[in-house]
């Protein structure tokens, strides 16, 4: 247990630690936990193997104590040095009778007690007697004095930790509002993306149309150039033919002159 305590401290000052979890660390007694933990408000010792509470330190600010699934059968008087205790879980231990629970009368602020899976719960009128013994108690084994079940584990923790249920409700409303805002923002962004895609598609079509027009103009220019070239070639051929014709006529006239001479 001592090594586990040092590990959980994580170099923090002892008098500044408010919560300590020593579950499953395996020890039959309290070892290494001292009166120096004056700020401790929550202590968990679930399934440690404790057979006695002898040596339990004086913890003036302790409000929540988890001792379930151990082998404790007596010695609850060692807990009375923590007068602010509001939540005590002793389920799964070896408590056999109500007399063993008498020391709990010292806890004037105790509102939640769990004794489930202890032989003491088999005593006749057990619940009625416990509520009478502990007037401040609101819940015993998960039910109130009218056998109404606790709403949730979080409700007990909120009450022990001093959290107001109204504040929790406000927080829930804020969360819902945030979710709505996120959904609205999500819709806007999707719409913007959709519009952007449409604009890009239109731009692509316009680009293709312009490219098509440019191609047509280029084809027209090429056709015009080909036509001009053909006309020039035809003109040259015509001139060549005229030249040949004139040359032939000149030769004929030359021969005629020679003949006449």
From Swiss-Prot:
The keyword Phosphoprotein applies. InterPro entries: AN32, Leu-rich_rpt, LRR_dom_sf. Pfam families: LRR_9 (PF14580). Residues 118-156 form the LRRCT domain. GO terms for biological process: nucleocytoplasmic transport. Residues 238-252 have a biased composition (Basic and acidic residues). It is found in: Nucleus; Cytoplasm. Keywords: Cytoplasm, Leucine-rich repeat, Nucleus, Phosphoprotein, Repeat. GO terms for molecular function: histone binding. Phosphorylated on serine residues. LRR repeats lie at residues 16-37, 39-60, 61-83, 84-105. It comes from the Eukaryota. PROSITE patterns: LRR. Residues 145-185, 194-229 have a biased composition (Acidic residues). One of its GO terms (cellular component) is perinuclear region of cytoplasm. Residues 145-261 are annotated as: Disordered. Belongs to the ANP32 family. Implicated in a number of cellular processes, including proliferation, differentiation, caspase-dependent and caspase-independent apoptosis, suppression of transformation (tumor suppressor), inhibition of protein phosphatase 2A, regulation of mRNA trafficking and stability, and inhibition of acetyltransferases as part of the INHAT (inhibitor of histone acetyltransferases) complex. This is Acidic leucine-rich nuclear phosphoprotein 32 family member A. It comes from Drosophila melanogaster (Fruit fly). The gene is Anp32a.
């Amino acid at each position: 247990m001592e090594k586990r305590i040092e590990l959980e401290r994580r170099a923090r000052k002892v008098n500044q630690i408010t919560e300590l979890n020593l579950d499953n660390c395996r020890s039959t007694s309290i070892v290494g936990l001292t009166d120096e933990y004056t700020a401790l408000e929550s202590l968990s010792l679930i399934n440690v193997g404790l057979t006695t509470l002898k040596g339990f330190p004086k913890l003036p600010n302790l409000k929540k104590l988890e001792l379930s699934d151990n082998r404790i059968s007596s010695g609850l008087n060692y807990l009375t040095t923590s007068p602010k205790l509001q939540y005590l879980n002793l389920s799964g231990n070896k408590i056999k009778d109500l007399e063993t629970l008498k020391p709990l009368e010292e806890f004037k602020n105790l509102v939640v007690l769990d004794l489930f899976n202890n032989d003491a719960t088999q005593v006749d009128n057990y619940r009625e007697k416990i509520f009478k013994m502990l007037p401040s108690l609101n819940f015993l084994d998960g039910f109130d004095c009218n056998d109404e079940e606790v709403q949730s584990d979080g409700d007990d923790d909120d009450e022990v930790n001093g959290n107001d249920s109204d504040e929790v409700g406000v927080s829930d409303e804020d969360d819902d509002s945030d979710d709505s805002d996120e959904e609205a923002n999500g819709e806007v962004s999707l719409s913007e993306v959709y519009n952007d895609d449409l604009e890009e598609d239109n731009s692509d079509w316009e680009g293709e149309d312009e490219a098509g027009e440019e191609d047509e103009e280029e084809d027209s220019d090429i056709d015009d150039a080909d036509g001009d070239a053909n006309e020039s070639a035809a003109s040259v051929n015509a001139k060549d033919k005229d030249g040949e014709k004139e040359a032939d006529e000149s030769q004929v006239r030359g021969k005629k002159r020679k003949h006449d001479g």
